[in-house]
Amino acid sequence: NDHIRPWTGFTELDKQAHKMFYAYVLAKCEGESVNMIKLIEGGIFEFFHRIVLTDIKPPIYHKLVKEKGFQIDNWVLSELEEHMDGIGGGFFERMKKYYLDKDYASLEKQILKAAHYHASNWEFKIIYPMNPQTFGIEQVKTEMAQGLAACDTFHGFRYFAGSKYLQEFLSLIGKLRYQQRWAKAVRMPETFVMGHMLVVAILSYFMSLELDNPCRKRLENNFFSGLFHDLPEVLTRDIVSPVKNSVKGLDSIISEIEDEQMREVIYPLLP
């Protein structure tokens, strides 16, 4: 937050949402060895962890985690515990295991780390040209490159690095970080489409945990359906319901246009 950036800025919510899009694609590149439930929950755990420490600059945050990680994790868990009572399915117990058992979800942690660096690098590519004279910018560039290189610990990372189309797909999705929801209405705070999609995904997952013995595939599908549900808006923008309902049949026409745009622009970027 101490560099010049676009006037809309960057929010932690949108960053965490973008990270989960990267995590999904990296997991698919890795293949069947990924436990998608652990990946989903790990992403939510790390989001909540970052919320508690959100005012700390990233370099300081990473240094603290590296040197005092166990103490910080325990403190964060104690801060979050009272707020987790309403989430069923043993969610908070798994969160404690995620942070206190270093062998738990090891592959999924690697994927989420890589996703974090990719989302951060997407931001940095925007910030860098705006800050050529800012003190320390070249050091940040070097640290970003080193951080990404250090994530080369699983096959899916290398597969993704060699796929121009998948990289373009996730760069395109990044545009949702700048699309304001209900732009003609006053919303405090302002919310953007990408962050909204993550909120829907997390709430869908939490509601799914309340079901009687939900199958793993249902949990996975409910989360990622929520995460991707507004993807066509990267091509059509956020057309609000009052506009869609103002003319009879307009909503159907918009849906047809969205389908057409998905076929022409999005699907060719996917394997």
Language-model features: where?
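Alpha-helical, largely C-terminal catalytic domains
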Residues: 1-271
